[in-house]
Amino acid sequence: MSMNSNAVKRKYQKCVDRMKNMKKKPEFHGSDLEKIADYYHLDKEKIVLFGANVNPLGLSGQVKKDLAEHLDIISSYPDRDYTDLKKAIAAYTNTSLEHIVVGNGSTELISLLISQRAPKRALLLGPTYSEYARELNLVGGTLEYYNLKEEQDFRLDISDLTDTLKSDIDLLIICNPNNPTSSAISTADMKKLLTVCRSLGIFVMIDETYIEFAPEGTSLSAVSLVPEFDNFMVIRGVSKFFAAPGLRFGYGLTSNQAFLQTLLTHQNPWSLNSVGAYAGERMLKDTDYIQKTWSHIDSERTRMCTELSGLDTVKIYPAYANFVLVRILKEGLTSFDVFEKAIHQNLMIRDCSSFESLNGEYVRFCIMNPEDNDRLLDVFRSL
């Protein structure tokens, strides 16, 4: 008995020692370039940002030229009402000027909306962008998730959701197309949902950050429903589609005039600076850049999904945004393992372990240029 006991103790101690010596998974956000480059001893300038979801075409050359010729605008305050910018937004979205609010990025508008609605109970379609939960926690309400189902390819079952909704829900938050699943809700289904929410007194926030990347953008956007429903607000920005995350320009659309006035009352004056207002106006009018983006994303997204569909080590899901969610099917291989395989090739994808309801089997990557996309395909082929 004593020999057996000692053997067990020695075996246990070996396991403990092995666990201590194992490389600890680093603590960083999947898109934290500085920390990731430092941890893996990489030159950050050489890392391809497959986790950032930003348009690979970069900032429009025409917008760069226009900005260079109008730098004197820095010496002037922006128009407090952002009249010219709102006219550009109205033309771009085919909406009325009176329905528009301009902000310092979509993040400011998300924060402003949540703080002013101050929901006691909020429902999020998950898994989704973590900033919604962070803002909701700041106002102290109860937060719940309605999780999209993997077996349904993360598509929303609109009937099941509407059956779930109750009148004690104050706010419903939807990202469409959704991050990180890249799934989307049609305008027709969104109309059904808004109708039910209106009857229950539920306000809906729809984040359309990625809608312009969708192959059927106009049949997915809720913008056309703005005049018909006053119980929701669409929020968009230019960080992703127009490759301008440093500009911090976003806008919201709602026909709820009372709520719109509340937002304006609590928003800081000149929330968007002169450069942001001017550049935003030029971006929305740059039809050549918009067309080139649609063409590039559509062709490369189709190619990447076709290639990955032929591998038995991964599963991909229908993608409506400029990014693709991938499930790792190979036994014993985690999302972090795949992240590390990619980062050692200077390719930074997103390990989705931190997303609500996603375990360590999922990664996400965005569409980049063909050469870098090929390099990432090689990583997946090597699994």
For the regions a protein language model found, what residue spans apply to each?
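PLP-dependent enzyme catalytic core of the Aspartate aminotransferase-like
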Residues: N4-A7, A188, H344-L347, S354-L383
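N-terminal "arm"/small-domain region of PLP-dependent enzymes with the aminotransferase-like
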Residues: N4-S76
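PLP-dependent aminotransferase class I/II
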Residues: L59-S60, D81, N231-Y317
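Short loop-beta-helix segment that forms the pyridoxal 5′-phosphate
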Residues: P78, A90-L112
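PLP-dependent aminotransferase-like
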Residues: Q116-I174
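Helix C-cap/helix->beta junction micro-motif
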Residues: V139, S199-L200, F229, Q345
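Active-site phosphate-binding strand-loop segment of PLP-dependent enzymes
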Residues: E150-A214
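Conserved PLP-binding catalytic core of the aspartate aminotransferase-like
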Residues: D298, L311-Q345
